[in-house]
Every structure is written in C-alpha cells, then in structure tokens.
Amino acid sequence: MGQLFSSPKSDENNDLPSSFTGYFKKFNTGRKIISQEILNLIELRMRKGNIQLTNSAISDALKEIDSSVLNVAVTGETGSGKSSFINTLRGIGNEEEGAAKTGVVEVTMERHPYKHPNIPNVVFWDLPGIGSTNFPPNTYLEKMKFYEYDFFIIISATRFKKNDIDIAKAISMMKKEFYFVRTKVDSDITNEADGKPQTFDKEKVLQDIRLNCVNTFRENGIAEPPIFLLSNKNVCHYDFPVLMDKLISDLPIYKRHNFMVSLPNITDSVIEKKRQFLKQRIWLEGFAADLVNIIPSLTFLLDSDLETLKKSMKFYRTVFGVDETSLQRLARDWEIEVDQVEAMIKSPAVFKPTDEETIQERLSRYIQEFCLANGYLLPKNSFLKEIFYLKYYFLDMVTEDAKTLLKEICLRN
C-alpha cells in the first residue's frame, strides 16, 4: 500500500485548513468529487474557527454527492446490443434476475428504467428504437421525456441506419449531450480475419469502422459526437474504458462519485479510479464532527465505531465486487467452493476473530501498519479517531482484493 500522505514540510502545510484543501490538489479536475468553490468555502470557515458552519458545509457536500440521481438514456435499434450494454454497466448477466431483456425482436415498446443494483441513484433507461415506435424523431424524444436524462447513448451495430441519423439529429437540435457507441466490433474483426487471413490488420479494421462513423455524421450535417467502439462480450477491450472516462469527466462534479463507484471492475485502471474517488470521500468524512476532535482520540474503538467500520467495509466490498454475493457468483462460475474464493483475498476475514487475535487486536495492528506506511495525516495538533485511519486501510485492502480477483478472472477466461 503506497504512501497516502506526506509529512508536513512548511508552515503552509502545517495548519488544518491548508491540509484539508491541499489534499484535493493531488486529484486532477476530471477526478474530483467536490468543486473548488465548495472547498474554498470550507477552508474559509475553518480559518474563521466556525466549526459548526464548517461541519454543515461538509455535511451538505456529502449529502449532495449521495443524493444525486443520474439518469442515462440508452437508445438503439433492435439487435444493436443496447440491453446487453445496460446489463454490462449494471454488472449483471443477461439471464440474471432484474436484467434488461435482450433479444433479436424489439422487446422495448416503452421506456423502461433499470436501477443499478448497488447504487440505485444511477438509473439506465432502455428506450425503444425509434424505428419500432413509428414516431417522428422530435415526437419520439418528447414521448420518451428527453428532458429527464443527463445524457443519451446511441447504440448502433454493423452499418449506420437512417434511424440512427434521425435520432442523432433530433438530440443535437435539442442541445442535449449524446455519445455514439458502435457495438459488436469483435464480430467485425472476426469476420475480417476469417475472410482476409493474408491481409488482415486489426487496427486498420477498427480505424475504418471509426472513420465510417465520422464520415456518416459529417455527410448528414451533424457535428460528430464522441464515438466509441466496443464489444459487450469483451468490455475490458476496445473503447469501453475510454467511454467510462469520458462520461465521468463530462458529468457535473457532484454526480461523478455515484457513477464511478457503480462501474463494473473491468480493468485495474477502473479499480484504481474507484479508490481515488473513495479516498476523497473518506477525507471529507474525516473532517466531519464525529471524526475530528480538539482532544486526543481514544486508544480503543467503541462498539458504535465497530458498527461504522463494518458498514464501511461492506460498502467497499460491494462497489469493488468482492462482497459475498459476488464471491458466490464467481464460485459458481469457476465450479469451486466459496471458501476457496475467499482464501484468495483478505477482506472477508477482517471481522472474523481467531484464537491468535481478537478483532480489536487486529484493528489496532492495522492502525499501526497504516501509520507506519503513511506518516503524518494532519498537523500534529489535530487528533483523529482511529476509525479514520481504518477506513483508508480497508479501502486499500479491498482495492487489492478486487485486482487479485480480476487477475484470476482473466486467467480463467
């Protein structure tokens, strides 16, 4: 686990307000979960010594992050793979309970919401293809209540169809953000490789597909949107990770957190970005009234602290896909016992006492390990309860667990 904080080296770093805002400077603009304006407000209130207003500002920021709702409209013609795309983003299989219905026949005649199973404030709306409704483009968008969505994703497979162009034009005219996703590129690559084994060039095939999309938009007088090539069967390849990055960076700051932690753990990069988002959240929580004190913290954890820690660990394990349900799914897919999957990672055993070590002793050891690895968290005249350190420790542990399982998944596939 890498060093999270550096030791204070100047008077500027050696005060609480500067420590608070300075921490967020390590995250680039597209990765922050709180705006600079709010950070400046919190720092100002800290400098004035108004603890109540400071805590109020931090609490309000956390509430806005937690309560923000993201509505994503996904539209495309029958067979384009839009329902599979929605299921992929929700981290569930096409045949699992609650999955968006897939098929070669249009199964969506009205818009249908699909909440993310772990982050219910993230909602994907499966819209019927415009061709199946017989509505003109503008009427289609009105019927689908276009104004309710944060952005649109247009899904298209194989070659462009008139309906793809019509819906893109209508969305553009209404000044709504949209992204174009060309699916099933794995099939295109396979077909080219089989048909032209001597001259096959994978990168050229992808380049030609992308260029065809660009030219089609231009020929129809549409400013080309962000274009992404992907396969719902191989989401860790092609443009899927790039698409996720683009969507997050384009979102309003306060809506980024929920979307980021909802994403499937398809690459080490996605897992690491989740960790960076959650680090910021823990930092905000660390300055809330129940974690920052003007007197030294207790040398032991209260029962209420343990419950808070268990809740945090459960949340981290869920968003990183190492919770009990996810482990059971992996065990079923790999045809092994759940205990064997649990043995590959560390987080399931954190709150299980052993003959050698009680839970309290284990948590105390974690705190010591964390402090040795990270040095100063805040100026020496500030005191934080152990729960703050442990949340960071748990986050690092679960992140590494997720990477371990992802590596195992790749080896077995």
Curated annotation (Swiss-Prot):
This protein's UniProt keywords: Cytoplasm, Disulfide bond, Endoplasmic reticulum, Golgi apparatus, GTP-binding, Hydrolase, Immunity, Innate immunity, Lipoprotein, Membrane, Myristate, Nucleotide-binding, Nucleus, Phosphoprotein
Gene Ontology terms describing biological process: cellular response to interferon-beta; cytokine-mediated signaling pathway; defense response to Gram-negative bacterium; defense response to protozoan; innate immune response; regulation of autophagy; response to bacterium
Domain IRG-type G per the UniProt entry, residue ranges: 68-250
Pfam families assigned: IIGP
PROSITE patterns: G_IRG
CDD domains noted in UniProt: p47_IIGP_like
Function, in words: GTPase with low activity. Has higher affinity for GDP than for GTP. Plays a role in resistance to intracellular pathogens. During infection with avirulent Toxoplasma gondii strains, recruited to the parasitophorous vacuole membrane. Required for disruption of the parasitophorous vacuole formed following T.gondii infection and subsequent killing of the parasite. Mediates resistance to Chlamydia trachomatis infection by targeting bacterial inclusions to autophagosomes for subsequent lysosomal destruction.
Official protein name in the record: Interferon-inducible GTPase 1
Upper taxonomic lineage: Eukaryota, Metazoa, Chordata, Craniata, Vertebrata
Chain's gene name: Iigp1
